[in-house]
Amino acid sequence: MMTVSGLTLVSRILGFLRDVLIARFVGTGPVADAFVAAFRFPNMFRRIFGEGAYNAAFVPLFGRKCEEQGSEAAVGFARNTFSALVWAVGILTLVAIPCMHWIMMVVVPGFLPKFEKDLGGIGHGKSFYECRVEVKGAREIYFQITGKSEAAVRHWSARTRVEDMHLLDPEGNKRKLLVSLKDEGFPIVASGQKEIASEGLILTQLSLSGDKHSGVGRDVDPRKRFVPREGEDVLEVIFGIDPTGLARIQLPQDHGMEHFVVQVMVGKVDEGTEIREAVLRIFRNHPENFDLTVALSRIMFCYLFFMALVAHLSGVLNTFRYFAVPAGAPILLNLVMLGSLGLVWFMRWEGDLEVGKSLAWGVALAGCLQFVVLWIACSRAGAAMVPHKPLWNPELKKLLFLMGPGVIAAGIQQVNLLVGGVIASFQQGAISTLYYADRVNQLPLGMIGIALGIVLLPEVTRRLRSGREAEAAHSILRGMELAMLLTLPAAAAMVAVHEPLIQGLFAGEKFSAEDVAKTGWALAGFALGLPGYVLIKVLQPAYFAREDTKRPMIMAGVAVAVNIGCSLLLFRLLLPGGYGHVGIAIATAVSAWVNVVLLWRGMDGFVKIPRSEWQRLLRMALASLLMGAVVYLAGLALESWLSGTVWQRMIALALIVGTGITVYGALVLSLGATSLSALRSSLMADRGREN
């Protein structure tokens, strides 16, 4: 397991660097949401197929072939399966790409343009329009003005006066709120700030022409000055033109507003210009975000084709005990995506859209490279996979029968994240926020849970095939103990210092303090289920080794139902405060623990936990809680460094992590939760499995 964990650690570190740079380039804006939503498909299939589920069906059958009929017959079975995969996934890819628009309507329904108002034609005699815009839970409001002629010119301004809204002053008293739009010109600034003004505030008129960028930041006269009346305050929001040419109102963080009134004026820029008919539409989300998601998904969907084949090749290599190459293949994905970001920097491409497209093409290229590397490794191992017309024989039928429920069962966390993404698409910025939080959560999950699952499945399968059930149960028990020893402190630390971790990793010009807070709380929600995620990886081999994929599938279905119910409930409860996405993270954790309970009860006593193991578990939990308190205090002490330069933040994070490891190590040894000899024997046993 050490080799697998080591290579996975390298991949996770590179993935961290990749995501830190993505956060620096695009933050949590519309392009970030579009890329993350589009990337979810190939990334989900990489985790489901490449990290256990396909192996759950293929490895036991392939392993039995090796044991009973020899490697030559087993390789023949693998080649036939490979050929079937090429045909099946190839057809799926060719069908899905042109149908991506309809697929994304299911995956991210919240990205569909949400018309708040459509004023239709304006400019025929009437020069003043007013409409009420609902903004509850929104981060931005978009205005789109289109004309029937390129010569159409609109001169308009916007202001809001909301009499039934209130803002708490420093003394806690409610005061009426006057909202003003502040022109920042082009390009638009990244985030708005609450500013309570004591004096009059300038309201700027903007001029827009047929050229989507024309006039911005120039035709600002005449200006109107207004003074808040008694009992009113002023809340500024940012108003400008985004890179796609849409007028945008960026609302302050935690604005608490439910609606405001927009006043639109149509007039002449100069005496020689006539007013033409125009159409004004107002959106609660970026009207082009859905189309961008579809375009990026089409580019990256070919990654699914390569990942299905990579999963098959990984299963062959893992059964032959070549763990290193499959475990190291994801490193290529991170390297290529880092190269894509480097290309954006080198070419000095400006705009989030170019970053999103460059990353999408990088993902597609990485899938091809991973396939080539694993195909060469299989060939050198004497198992070259050459596609041919597949034979529809009983072995292939059995594999397909086992693979379906196995994919669902082993991919339960990814199914949960997919469901969460559907719900999160209705909150602006939530999809990218959940992505960044999940990436941090994936570090211990990838190093511990996935590595344990990959190594345990072939080992448990071999021992059950040879009738050594007690040894198989002992392997699972040791895996559970090691999983809890490592994940309990990781979960405690991520809950205790959720915001400092995100601050140190992602904070930047396009990743605001609001983004840090929201991502941090999502990380805390995911961390509550971290031990559960890893236990699922440890317990499932007890079923898959017996070729039982039906019961785990049913259990996974129950967990998904729990996840959907909890996500809908908690999202609705927390959305008014802007934290609906945290409810999705908590629901994912709850569903993971439900799945663990069902898997444990379904084993019918196959693995028994002695009293001494329960005592060690309680000591691990106590050590984790005490360590969590220590790192929380460390985070407070290093708060200024976490807000400093990149190097200061990295040093602060290293100090926090180092303190946590040292304190926890000392506590588990002093409390008797484990011993150095026990750790050494576990690691040596895992190394023996790899060799």
What are these regions (language model features)?
Residues D118-G125, L177-I241, P252:
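Disordered, acidic Ser/Thr/Pro-rich linker "stalks" and the adjacent N-terminal cap
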Residues Q144-A152, Q263-V269:
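Short beta-strand-plus-loop segments that form exposed binding edges in beta-rich domains
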Residues M105-G137, A151-A152, S157, N173, ...:
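Internal, charge-rich low-complexity segments
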